[in-house]
A protein has these predicted regions:
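Short secondary-structure boundary elements
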Residues: 1-127
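Charged, low-complexity surface patches
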Residues: 2, 180, 192, 220, ...
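Start-of-helix signal in alpha-solenoid helical-repeat scaffolds, especially tetratricopeptide repeats
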Residues: 30, 34, 51, 55, ...
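Tandem amphipathic alpha-helical repeat scaffolds
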Residues: 40, 80-84, 97-101, 116-131, ...
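Flexible helix-coil transition and linker loops at the boundaries of alpha-helical arrays
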Residues: 63-71, 85-88, 128-135, 139-160, ...
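Tetratricopeptide repeat
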Residues: 78, 97-98, 135, 139-146, ...
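Conserved small-residue-rich
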Residues: 137, 143-144, 156-177, 182-185, ...
Length: 253
């Protein structure tokens, strides 16, 4: 009865071309077709209620995450809804996930993403791929805004370290070594301040990759030593294996 009334109401709206179903979704989802109707509905809802609704919708999208490359389609929704909800740190987390996807570190020595991952074929994806420099500037501005608005909270510090790692890797990969190293050294410093051993290890590894690229075997040896000690302290067996392979490489360079 109540569900039936809702369904009948939706059918009336659909028959009058006010809404349409969103295809290829596991649940039944409708979207508003007419822009003026969207604007009217927005005007009827207070700003506070809009924020609550956007936060609720973001939560629904998060439940659909599969922790696979296909999640990139959901990251754009999550970034938008968290931004509209005023949850800047959550927005930033998904913006950085989008950035990581499009930087696609498949050419790195030990890639995070497979080059076989398929880029989604949509307008947003094509825009980012063809305007990467502009997108990087947007992300940089976003980080300044988040730090200015939210202050130095643990969540903001974690976001900042993630950002420094991504940007450092990117700049080193494209040969802008000065920028890249500056970001990675800043990452190591910040991670040490908050005793975040995972980010410290990420920073050390990135400096090792940089030293391989420029042939600096002595500095590489030093970073390998501190990285191996840290990985041993943390019982990170997989990381130990990677670092020992790199140590072997260092010995024959």
């Amino acid at each position: 009865p109540e569900h039936l009334q809702v369904f009948q109401g939706l059918e009336v709206l659909r028959n009058n071309n006010f809404i349409r179903p969103v295809p290829q979704q596991p649940e039944v989802i409708y979207e508003i077709v007419q822009q003026k109707l969207k604007e009217y509905i927005h005007q009827q809802i207070s700003l506070e209620k809009q924020k609550i609704l956007h936060s609720y919708i973001a939560g629904l999208w998060e439940k659909r995450l599969t922790h696979s490359p296909q999640d990139i389609r959901l990251y754009h929704h999550l970034e938008y809804h968290y931004q509209e909800a005023g949850e800047l740190v959550n927005m930033g987390r998904y913006k950085l996930k989008i950035l990581m996807y499009y930087l696609n570190f498949s050419n790195e020595l030990f890639p995070v993403l497979s080059s076989a991952d398929i880029m989604p074929d949509d307008d947003k994806s094509r825009y980012i791929e063809s305007n990467l420099g502009k997108f990087l500037a947007e992300v940089d501005e976003m980080m300044h805004t988040i730090k200015r608005t939210c202050g130095e909270t643990p969540e903001v510090r974690d976001l900042e370290m993630n950002y420094l790692h991504l940007m450092g890797r990117h700049y080193i990969r494209v040969g802008e070594y000065e920028k890249g190293v500056r970001n990675i050294l800043s990452l190591i410093e910040q991670a040490a301040e908050v005793h975040n051993r995972d980010y410290m290890l990420m920073g050390y590894k990135q400096m090792i990759y940089y030293d391989i690229q420029i042939g600096n075997t002595e500095e590489m040896k030093n970073y390998l030593e501190v990285a191996l000690n840290l990985a041993d302290e943390c019982n990170y067996h997989k990381e130990m294996g990677i670092l020992l392979r790199l140590k072997g490489l260092n010995m024959i360079m």
